[in-house]
């Protein structure tokens, strides 16, 4: 089995160079994994999927911006009289949470989800970014690029090779859900990423969160209005 542990920089700095023997006192046992799920019923059983993660809340943009924006999107959707499509919204631990959720719900998700977004890093005001699904040609991809083109013509386009969040699981071979990402500055592309400086003073701003919220809201509105009239 593989193992490892975390320690603070101050603790690390006290260690001298050399070899260490490590004793890890741990056990393997059946536990539990908790996640939040909200299903909003629309006229159709076809679903738009929103996923965000809740596993490392000390970081403002890389973590808290997603749940914050998704919470307000859920509030807005529940205030609408009735949407054309249904909505599946989940708050999960990153990676293991999406794997767990897929293991329990994959068949239902595959039958119902036709569009969706993984919501991460939507709180800064430095850029707008787009990360495609593995397919790159889903309605989620087309809508994301269309919306961002009008918000910021200079938005950053990443490739599927730049993936690093739960889109890895949702778009994995054999799963292939139509999930893209609309972000502000992408994870790993700002200097405060995965440090204590990813906070409300240095990275996340009210304007940044508002921009992240409206980018995804406009994408949802575009999907709702995307109809063929006879």
Annotate each language-model stretch with its function.
Residues 1-230:
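N-terminal hydrophobic/helix-forming segments and targeting peptides
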């Amino acid at each position: 089995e593989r193992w490892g542990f975390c320690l603070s920089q101050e603790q690390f700095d006290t260690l001298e160079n050399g070899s260490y023997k490590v004793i890890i006192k741990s056990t393997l046992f059946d536990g539990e994994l908790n996640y939040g799920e909200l299903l909003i019923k629309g006229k159709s059983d076809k679903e738009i999927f929103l996923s965000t993660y809740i596993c490392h809340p000390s970081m403002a943009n890389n973590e808290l911006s997603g749940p914050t924006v998704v919470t307000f999107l859920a509030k807005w959707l529940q205030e609408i009289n009735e949407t054309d499509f249904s909505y599946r919204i989940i708050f999960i631990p990153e990676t293991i949470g999406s794997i767990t959720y897929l293991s329990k719900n994959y068949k239902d998700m595959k039958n119902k989800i036709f569009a969706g977004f993984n919501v991460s890093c939507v709180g800064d005001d430095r850029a707008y970014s787009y990360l495609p699904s593995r397919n790159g040609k889903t309605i989620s991809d087309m809508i994301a690029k269309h919306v961002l083109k009008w918000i910021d013509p200079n938005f950053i386009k990443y490739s599927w090779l730049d993936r690093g969040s739960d889109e890895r699981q949702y778009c994995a071979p054999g799963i292939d859900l139509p999930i893209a990402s609309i972000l502000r500055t992408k994870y790993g592309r700002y200097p405060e990423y995965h440090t204590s400086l990813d906070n409300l003073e240095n990275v996340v701003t009210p304007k940044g969160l508002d921009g992240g919220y409206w980018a995804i809201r406009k994408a949802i509105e575009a999907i709702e209005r995307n109809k063929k009239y006879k």
